[in-house]
Amino acid sequence: MTDVPSKPPQTTPPPKPKSRAPTTIFSSPPQLPDRSSLNISHTASTPTLTPTPLQQQQIHTDGNSQQPKSSPPPLPERQSFSNSPNRQTQSFIQKPALPPRDSQYNTISGSTVFKSNNNINNNNNDSHIITNGNASTSFIQGNRVTRVLNTNKSEPILQQPQQSHSPQQQQQQHTPNHQQPLSPQQQKDLAQKRSTMPLPPRPNKNRPLPTPISPESHPLTINEENSITEDKEQQPQQSAPPQPQLQQSQQNTDNSRKPIVAPPTPTIQ
């Protein structure tokens, strides 16, 4: 028997390592720069940071290429709203400037507004607006607005007709009989009457309410009850004729819608 040579075991070749970017391994965590090294400008604009040379190298270098990148352009500075010169252009609604006010009158859209404190109604809150035929509702100052549409026509103020009477006649007309001046003797008599008249009783809040009267203690109620009971007992003993009661019940049904009630049967003794 011939010996068969044994084949050596096939060994798989090791896989080729893939090409990787060079990795930077930090032995210790990176230290942050101090606040004193950062130049921060305390203004309304965005703060501009000036990095240190070590930071600059880490920012501008990439893993694949060692060439520094171009830095981004700086942002424009922001203007605060209070310091901006064109503040009216930035607002949405531009209000027109009012004409200058005078101390005596105001001219607003062709209408003259007079401020007067001594009005007919003696109301300081009134403002009189005089327009030339234009019904304009413009509240300038106060609560009430008086519009004079036609300045050519002026209505006269209504005055009461003067009565040609002597002062004695006026006094007799206006003063009634009980308000006429009294003589000194009448005044003394009236004072004596008032002193002798008894005063009306004053209401006492602390006085208790009167107790209700029981029917047993009052004799009138007992007599009334006895008289009523006697009448009730005497009614069935009297034999009343039934015919007039029937006529009354029929008349009642004609006038009002009440049911016909049968007459009571007389008790036979």
From Swiss-Prot:
Residues 46-58, 159-181 have a biased composition (Low complexity). Residues 21-45, 80-93, 182-195 have a biased composition (Polar residues). Residues 1-110, 157-269 are annotated as: Disordered. Residues 1-16, 198-213 have a biased composition (Pro residues). This is Putative uncharacterized protein DDB_G0282269.
